[in-house]
Structures are given as structure tokens and as C-alpha cells.
């Protein structure tokens, strides 16, 4: 699905609302360094973020949890990327340390009806805990409500079902600084374009999905407020489930309609792969691409000095660990913060291998290492 947005969007309005009278050039390197010291995102209902470092379980609390013999299910929106696998790895590792058995891991393929079915199937096993990310906050709300009313303790990644109240309907929500990662991708785009700037395009997620909208808003507001030498000339949305294929079509249309485009931002790594394919098909080896999420394919491109010049990375493994600990809070009856966020991680070729360790808690793959120039 392709949709096109007006080029005067909410992010420009946000920049004006924040009192930015006239854009002034930013120093991308200084802005990127400062970004890692704070969290810019708010929670789904406007909650202030709590730091992940505050979520801790004592040895005594861990011992109590182990005695419970609790079970958990992980209900994913989509399992086909490195981010999802890292979340699952973090969850399984921490649940194992807590003596909690993971009885199911599901992949909805970004289809709300499949996720509803997954939840119904899982509830037949009566898990004590469900950790999940809703594909659609409205379409899945009734299924999550039924799980909550049946006694499952809910911890969410990134997004929450419509009408759910923290501390009442669910334990907590954990997220990366998605607004901050959009900001990081904008500064990295500006750095790669250089002082002359130029025309760019955006490939956004055309869905009611809180975190991808935050990335879009962060990227667009930063370009509007900090880089008057950069002009967004085209935007197209993708709805999936073939996000790479949809992005290839969207980017191809952009490059045909706007031959002077120097760069394209993609909302996460899988669409960025489609943008790379479009660049190759259109003979645009000079195209600059920035994105969010450190997947292996975009990391290989970055390592090779290819299309991907920079990205804002989440910390999905660490997020999974925090989500499991928050589930432990619920088992203990311990008060949990409403919204926990991990700071953005700007990634370029210079820090790629170190960033991989931070994101995945493991060494970079051999494919990434072998691609480093």
C-alpha cells in the first residue's frame, strides 16, 4: 500500500509550536553526542520516561519469583527482522534467569487478525505473563482485554492497546527513544549530505503505529528546525506486509519524479533494504540512505561504505531484559513505572562494530565483520 502525505506536516508544526522562529544550521556531530545523554520520547499516553537502569530485582526477589513456577508467552507483531529476534533473546535469557518458563513465541506477520488468534490460542494454556507488541492498538484491544481479565499480567513493547490504563490494565510499556532515533537519522542525513544539503524523500509507515510515527515526527521536525539547506520534496507511505517490496516501489517512484533527490530516509531497516534496491535499479549509486534499526543487511551496506550512511539504533536485547524484569515486578506485586525508555544510539561506519555489541549483546556477525572497509 502506498500513500502520499502533504509536505507541510505535523513535525513542521511541532517545530513552530516549540518556538523555533527561524531555522539555523546545527552541528550534526555535537547534536548526535548530546542526543545520547537524554530520552526525547514520551509514552503512548504522554508519560515521562523512567530509565531502564531503575528496573532492578534483588536476589531475594529473584528467589521468590523462582519459587512461583510461573509461565510466560511472547506475542510478537512481526518476527521477520533482527530487532524482533533480539527482543525475544533478551526476554528468554532473563526469564530463564528468573525461573520462568516461556511456553509460546508467536509471530503475527503484522496482521491484527492473526495476533488476535495467537492470543486466543495462547490463553488456552493460561500463561501467568504475556509480553507483546500490538499490531494495531484498536483491532487487538478486545483480545488483550480478555487476556487481562483472565488473569494474565501484560507487559508491552513500544505500543499499548486502545483504552488501556497503566498499572490497571497492564504492568508497563518499554520502548526505545523512537523520537530520538528519528532525530538521530536526521542529523546523520545532514552530516552525509554535507554543507550544501539538497533534496530528500521520506518512506514512512502508513499505519496507526505509535513508535513509527514518533520516528517520522522526530526526523521531520529536526530537518525543519535545524537544516534549512535540506528540502523534503516527496513522502510516500507503506503498509506492508511486504515492507521491502513496498518501499522499493515507493522509492522508485520518488527517484523517477524527483531526479535531484540526494537522500531518502526509511522508517526502519527492512524498508531501507527496498530503498537500496530501488537505488540500484535506477542507477543511483550515489544515493544517501538513513534509517532506524540495526539489521544485518543495512549493517553490511554501512560496513562496505554503501548506501546506508547512518541510522538510529534501538537496544532491543536490553529492552527484552527490562520487560522480563517488569513481569517479575507484577508477580511480586511491586509497583512498576508506567513507561520505561532506553536512549537512542546513533550508528555510522565508525562505531558500527561497537554499536552491534550494544544492540544485540553479542559480537557482530561474520558477514558484517567481513564487509568492514
Predicted regions and their residues:
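N-terminal export leaders
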Residues: 4-8
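A residue-level marker of the well-folded mature domains of exported/periplasmic proteins
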Residues: 2, 24-373
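A periodicity- and composition-biased signal for non-globular, repetitive helical segments
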Residues: 10-11, 221
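Bacterial N-terminal signal peptides
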Residues: 11-19
Amino acid at each position: 500500500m502506498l500513500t502520499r502525505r502533504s509536505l507541510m506536516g505535523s513535525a513542521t508544526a511541532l517545530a513552530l509550536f516549540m518556538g523555533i522562529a527561524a531555522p539555523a544550521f546545527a552541528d550534526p556531530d555535537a547534536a548526535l553526542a548530546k542526543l545520547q545523554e537524554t530520552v526525547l520520547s514520551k509514552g503512548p499516553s504522554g508519560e515521562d520516561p523512567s530509565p531502564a537502569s531503575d528496573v532492578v530485582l534483588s536476589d531475594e526477589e529473584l528467589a521468590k519469583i523462582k519459587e512461583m513456577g510461573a509461565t510466560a508467552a511472547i506475542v510478537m507483531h512481526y518476527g521477520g527482522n533482527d530487532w524482533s529476534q533480539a527482543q525475544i533473546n533478551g526476554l528468554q535469557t532473563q526469564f530463564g534467569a528468573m525461573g520462568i518458563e516461556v511456553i509460546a513465541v508467536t509471530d503475527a506477520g503484522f496482521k491484527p487478525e492473526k495476533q488476535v488468534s495467537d492470543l486466543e490460542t495462547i490463553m488456552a494454556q493460561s500463561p501467568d505473563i504475556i509480553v507483546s507488541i500490538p499490531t494495531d492498538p484498536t483491532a487487538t484491544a478486545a483480545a488483550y482485554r480478555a487476556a487481562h481479565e483472565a488473569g494474565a499480567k501484560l507487559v508491552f513493547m513500544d505500543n499499548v492497546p486502545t483504552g488501556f490504563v497503566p498499572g490497571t490494565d497492564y504492568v508497563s510499556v518499554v520502548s526505545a527513544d523512537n523520537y530520538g532515533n528519528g532525530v538521530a537519522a536526521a542529523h546523520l542525513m545532514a552530516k552525509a549530505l554535507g554543507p550544501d544539503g539538497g533534496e530528500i524523500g521520506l518512506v514512512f509507515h502508513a499505519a496507526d503505529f505509535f513508535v513509527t510515527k514518533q520516528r517520522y515526527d522526530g526526523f521531520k521536525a529536526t530537518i525543519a528546525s535545524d537544516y534549512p539547506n535540506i528540502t523534503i520534496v516527496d513522502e510516500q507511505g507503506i503498509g506492508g506486509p511486504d515492507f521491502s517490496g513496498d518501499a522499493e516501489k515507493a522509492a522508485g517512484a520518488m527517484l523517477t519524479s524527483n531526479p535531484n533527490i540526494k537522500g531518502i530516509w526509511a522508517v526502519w531497516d527492512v524498508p531501507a533494504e527496498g530503498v537500496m534496491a530501488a537505488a540500484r535499479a535506477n542507477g543511483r549509486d550515489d544515493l544517501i540512505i538513513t534509517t532506524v534499526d540495526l539489521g544485518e543487511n543495512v549493517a553490511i551496506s554501512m560496513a562496505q561504505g554503501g548506501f546506508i550512511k547512518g541510522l538510529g539504533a534501538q537496544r532491543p536485547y536490553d529492552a527484552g531484559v527490562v520487560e522480563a524484569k517488569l513481569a517479575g515486578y507484577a508477580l511480586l506485586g511491586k509497583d512498576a513505572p508506567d513507561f520505561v525508555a532506553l536512549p537512542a544510539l546513533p550508528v555510522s561506519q565508525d562505531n558500527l562494530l561497537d554499536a552491534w555489541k550494544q544492540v544485540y549483546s553479542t559480537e557482530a556477525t561474520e558477514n558484517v565483520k567481513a564487509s568492514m572497509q
